[in-house]
């Protein structure tokens, strides 16, 4: 700062840009433009409070410094006075400096632009700006295309991954299904092979004494095949085995020829007994239960039967009798729950059957009883088969006599009846509402023309009023003449009203004309029959009396 202050000011910085003379009391504006005080007073304060070079508003700054009298840059003014004292003195005295005039004269002449030069510069600038704009738009378009391509590629990749995952899952599922089908087919082949081998071995050893036993064996073999094909038929066989008292359960036929090997007979009832019982097995639950039971325990039961028959380890038939009783109770509960119309119930075991049906699952109970039946068969069953059949006949005869209504089925029937009744009542209410709405619409469409209604007919005046008027006229005619003064005037007024009605095209009715003619005739007759006094009275009052009238009045007096 000190070096700048010590350096001499160039002459160009000491000249006012407005008056082109030495600065006199220079004023430095906030925008760093400097001009002399007289020029500041003339241009800024009087014209506008803005800088004459950059148009910056300096009103606040000018008011503040004029109030404090600090408009003049004293430091610059002192330096100018030190460097150029003569010019400052000459300027203060009002004389023009010759040096400045010489400098102005020595300035080079201004150069003018060539024709079309400015237009060319303008067009060049416009083309430059347009090129920049096009380049920017092209860059934006390219960026948007790249982004769209990127999004499409990502979406295609996601779709491809999803399709691959779905295809992989389908292939895995197909593999699992193939393995399951293969295992099922192998199990089915093994079971069929074992059944065929067992049947071939037993056919040599078993000697059937009766033709009914051959029929039962054939039905048993067919039942083994139907166990895999028709679950409903298997369910019929499985349930009737526990309920049919006449089926020969667990009795043994000995082969007299070959080492007396025992063999279990098939547990299949005849079709005639099924028809006699009338058990209708149309519910899918029993067939499903027995299908699961047959699939899980068929081979184990056959193996256990063979081992027990070969070893000869059979227990007594007392346990089988108890199990048959429990099986009958369970079957009563199942048939009572599923078929309420054909329920089987014994009076002493009714509560037990209901509790057993609620507490234990049906298919588990059936599987347990079938296993124990096969395990508890003994060699001496021929002697005790009759007692077993008698016990079962007694139990089933008691159950057939006493049907039990199912509580659940009764509730369902009652609920269905309530719903049907409610539906019927709602339909009746709907029909009644429609009928009432139709009647209401019909009443609204009808027009009431009765008396007192807004749409009543505008009737003519009654004939009774006209008759009363005629009677009044007759009474007036019969009355003395002074009372009959005003009557003709009223009739005339009424006639004039009828004649001068507002409707000019309206014609008088024929009856009124006839009636008016009769009234006039009667009045004329009355006037002729009356005395001269009556004639005088009927004359108009405002008429000027004649001499004859005066003589008549005097004669009358």
From Swiss-Prot:
The protein's name in its UniProt record: E3 ubiquitin-protein ligase rnf168
Protein localization: Nucleus
Recorded name of the encoding gene: rnf168
Assembly and interaction partners: Monomer.
RING-type zinc finger segments: 16-55
Recorded GO CC terms: nucleus; site of double-strand break; ubiquitin ligase complex
Record's catalysed reaction(s): S-ubiquitinyl-[E2 ubiquitin-conjugating enzyme]-L-cysteine + [acceptor protein]-L-lysine = [E2 ubiquitin-conjugating enzyme]-L-cysteine + N(6)-ubiquitinyl-[acceptor protein]-L-lysine
Pfam families: zf-C3HC4 (PF00097)
Motif (LR motif 1): 112-130
Motif MIU motif 2 mapped to chain: 422-445
Keywords for the protein's UniProt record, in alphabetical order: Chromatin regulator, DNA damage, DNA repair, Metal-binding, Nucleus, Transferase, Ubl conjugation pathway, Zinc, Zinc-finger
S-S bonds: none
GO terms, biological process: DNA damage response; DNA repair-dependent chromatin remodeling; double-strand break repair; isotype switching; negative regulation of transcription elongation by RNA polymerase II; positive regulation of DNA repair; protein K63-linked ubiquitination; protein ubiquitination
PROSITE patterns assigned: ZF_RING_2
Compositionally biased region (Polar residues): 490-500
Domain of life: Eukaryota
Family named by the database record: Belongs to the RNF168 family.
Biased composition (Basic residues): 508-521
Motif position, MIU motif 1: 170-193
InterPro entries: RNF168, RNF168/RNF169_E3_ubiq-ligase, Znf_C3HC4_RING-type, Znf_RING, Znf_RING/FYVE/PHD
């Amino acid at each position: 700062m000190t070096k700048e202050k010590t350096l001499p000011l160039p002459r160009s910085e000491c000249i006012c840009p407005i008056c082109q003379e030495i600065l006199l009391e220079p004023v430095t504006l906030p925008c760093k433009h400097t001009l002399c005080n007289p020029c500041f007073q003339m241009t800024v304060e009087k014209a506008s409070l803005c800088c004459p070079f950059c148009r910056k508003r300096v009103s606040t700054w000018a008011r503040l410094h004029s109030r404090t009298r600090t408009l003049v840059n004293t430091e610059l003014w002192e330096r100018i006075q030190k460097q150029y004292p003569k010019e400052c003195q000459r300027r203060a005295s009002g004389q023009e400096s010759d040096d400045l005039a010489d400098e102005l004269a020595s300035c080079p002449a201004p150069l003018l632009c060539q024709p079309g030069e400015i237009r060319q510069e303008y067009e060049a600038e416009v083309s430059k700006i347009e090129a920049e704009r096009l380049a920017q738009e092209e860059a934006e378009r390219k960026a948007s295309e790249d982004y769209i391509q990127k999004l499409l590629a990502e979406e295609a990749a996601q779709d491809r991954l999803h399709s691959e995952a779905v295809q992989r899952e389908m292939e895995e599922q197909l593999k699992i299904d193939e393995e399951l089908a293969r295992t099922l087919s192998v199990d089915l082949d093994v079971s069929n092979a074992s059944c065929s081998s067992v049947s071939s071995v037993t056919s040599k050893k078993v000697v059937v004494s009766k033709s009914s036993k051959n029929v039962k064996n054939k039905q048993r073999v067919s039942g083994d095949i139907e166990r895999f094909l028709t679950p409903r038929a298997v369910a019929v066989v499985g349930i009737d085995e526990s309920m049919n008292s006449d089926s020969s359960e667990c009795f043994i036929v000995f082969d007299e020829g070959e080492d007396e090997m025992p063999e279990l007979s098939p547990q299949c009832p005849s079709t005639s007994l099924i028809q006699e019982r009338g058990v209708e097995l149309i519910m899918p639950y029993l067939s499903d239960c027995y299908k699961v039971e047959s699939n899980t325990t068929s081979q184990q039961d056959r193996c256990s039967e063979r081992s027990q028959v070969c070893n000869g380890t059979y227990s007594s038939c007392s346990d089988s009798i108890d199990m048959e009783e429990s099986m009958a109770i369970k079957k009563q509960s199942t048939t009572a729950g599923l078929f309420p119309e054909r329920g089987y119930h014994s009076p002493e075991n009714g509560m037990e059957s209901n509790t057993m049906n609620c507490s234990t699952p049906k298919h588990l109970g059936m599987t347990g009883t079938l296993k124990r039946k096969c395990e508890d068969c003994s060699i001496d069953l021929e002697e005790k088969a009759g007692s077993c059949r008698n016990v079962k006949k007694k139990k089933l005869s008691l159950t057939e006599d006493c049907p039990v209504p199912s509580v659940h089925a009764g509730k369902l029937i009652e609920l269905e009846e309530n719903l049907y009744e409610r539906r019927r009542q709602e339909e009746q209410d709907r029909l009644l509402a429609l009928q009432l709405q139709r009647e209401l619409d019909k009443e609204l469409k009808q027009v009431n023309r009765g008396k007192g209604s807004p749409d009543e007919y505008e009737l003519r005046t009654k004939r009774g009023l006209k008759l009363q008027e005629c009677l009044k006229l007759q009474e007036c005619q019969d009355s003395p003449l002074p009372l009959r003064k005003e009557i003709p005037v009223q009739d005339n007024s009424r006639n004039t009203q009828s004649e001068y009605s507002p409707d000019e095209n309206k014609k008088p009715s024929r009856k009124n004309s006839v009636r008016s003619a009769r009234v006039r005739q009667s009045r004329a007759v009355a006037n002729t029959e009356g005395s001269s006094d009556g004639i005088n009275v009927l004359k108009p009052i405002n008429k000027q009396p004649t001499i004859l009238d005066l003589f008549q009045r005097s004669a009358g007096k």
